[in-house]
Curated annotation (Swiss-Prot):
It comes from Saccharomyces cerevisiae (strain ATCC 204508 / S288c). It is a multi-pass membrane protein. Keywords: Membrane, Transmembrane, Transmembrane helix. The keyword Nucleotidyltransferase does not apply. It comes from the Eukaryota. Partially overlaps GAT1. Its main location: membrane. This is Putative uncharacterized membrane protein YFL021C-A. One of its GO terms (cellular component) is membrane. It is found in: Membrane. The chain crosses the membrane at residues 174-194, 217-237, 241-261.
């Protein structure tokens, strides 16, 4: 499996080391489109065997004095900043991911052409998000990586907050990861909130149709904010109402924020005063 990043933009490229690997995955899953989800255990195993590599493949004829191979101990931010004109490839041995159950999850036909790939959150460990303690072996969930987002966020992030909610057996576990940056305009804050609300409602609708399907998606806001929302189970009318109330509260907070809504203090007031929207549903 090969993921390509060009100047911070994710381009999905799937390659199998052999035709036998592809046939084996198809045999286990029953669908030839099964491409690209890797469990945390599989990634961990692959890393420990040094079968995961990151490499910068230069697109220019000029040679660089710095090494093009990404070391596991190297800071990815510096690695990216020093190599602007290159492809950054992340390679995972497909054979090393095969033994574990559910090592791959089928994607809809044509999904790869849209430059969208679904991986578990622990893929972030591969690129050393050392301050994100989001990955646990017992709590597996997916993060949707859309074109251009993952390394963009890596390169410019300044603060990460993790919110985890549990509400007994009636509701599933809700994860919200908000990546906050140094300047956020009030209009962007409102726009991001509306954007989150629309996508959250869409996701809960999908969950309701699929009987407790769990998914986690990356929602790109305009300019300087990204939010990860974990939606568990089918949506309910009460959940939609709660999300709408949170949205309205966020807009009120953003509109009433004094000044030009720039700077760290204003950003924190804007985002930490419930200026995030979450969606949660009943588990089956």
């Amino acid at each position: 499996m090969l993921l390509l990043f060009k100047n911070g933009k994710l381009l999905v490229k799937i390659k199998w080391s052999s035709k036998e690997d592809e046939q084996e995955v198809s045999r286990k899953l029953g669908k030839p489109e099964a491409l690209c989800e890797a469990r945390w255990e599989a990634l961990s195993m692959s890393l420990s065997r040094s079968e995961c590599t990151m490499e910068c493949v230069s697109t220019s004829s000029s040679s660089s004095s710095s090494s093009n191979t990404f070391s596991k101990t190297e800071d990815p931010l510096r690695f990216m900043s020093e190599r602007k004109n290159c492809w950054l490839s992340v390679s995972v041995s497909s054979r090393s991911l095969l033994p574990g159950p559910a090592a791959f999850t089928p994607l809809a036909k044509g999904e790869a052409e849209k430059s969208i790939i679904e991986l578990e959150c622990c893929i972030m460990r591969l690129i050393r998000w050392k301050d994100v303690r989001l990955c646990k072996r017992q709590e597996r969930f997916k993060i949707r990586l859309e074109s251009g987002n993952i390394f963009w966020a890596l390169e410019y992030r300044s603060q990460i907050s993790l919110f985890k909610f549990k509400s007994g057996s009636r509701f599933g576990t809700l994860f919200v990861l908000i990546v906050m940056f140094t300047t956020v305009h009030r209009v962007q804050c409102i726009y991001i909130s509306i954007y989150i609300y629309a996508h959250a409602m869409n996701r809960t609708g999908e969950g309701r149709k699929s009987k407790g399907k769990k998914t986690c998606m990356l929602i790109p806001g305009p300019g300087v904010a990204h939010t990860y929302i974990y939606v568990a189970g089918p949506g309910t009318a009460s959940v939609r109402l709660i999300v709408l109330l949170l949205l309205l509260l966020c807009i009120v907070v953003a509109v009433n924020t004094s000044g030009s809504c720039t700077g760290t203090n204003t950003m924190l007031r804007c985002f930490t005063s419930f200026c995030y929207v979450s969606a949660c549903g009943r588990t089956q």
